[in-house]
Amino acid sequence: MPKMKTRKTAAKRFHVTGTGKIMRSKGMKSHLRRNKSARVRRQFDEMSQVAGVDRARIQKLIPYGVS
């Protein structure tokens, strides 16, 4: 059976941890940050875990767990 192809757009946006969790970046980081508090801006910089309902779809996009 041929190798499965990794969707490169998904590989740039998600990464898989050593324990198998799929992590993503949070949105709202690029602009319109001035009216947000420093605490909220720091929270946007953290990585977030992908929701369980989306996990199976993303695993199909990155079958080899590209990090």
Curated annotation (Swiss-Prot):
Pfam hit, one: Ribosomal_L35p
Biological process, per Gene Ontology: translation
GO cellular component: cytosolic large ribosomal subunit
Keywords: Ribonucleoprotein, Ribosomal protein
Single GO MF descriptor: structural constituent of ribosome
Gene3D superfamilies for the chain: 4.10.410.60
PANTHER family, sorted: 54S RIBOSOMAL PROTEIN BL35M, LARGE RIBOSOMAL SUBUNIT PROTEIN BL35M
Similarity-based family: Belongs to the bacterial ribosomal protein bL35 family.
HAMAP family: Ribosomal_bL35 (MF_00514)
Protein name per Swiss-Prot or TrEMBL: Large ribosomal subunit protein bL35
Organism: Dehalococcoides mccartyi (strain ATCC BAA-2266 / KCTC 15142 / 195)
Gene: rpmI
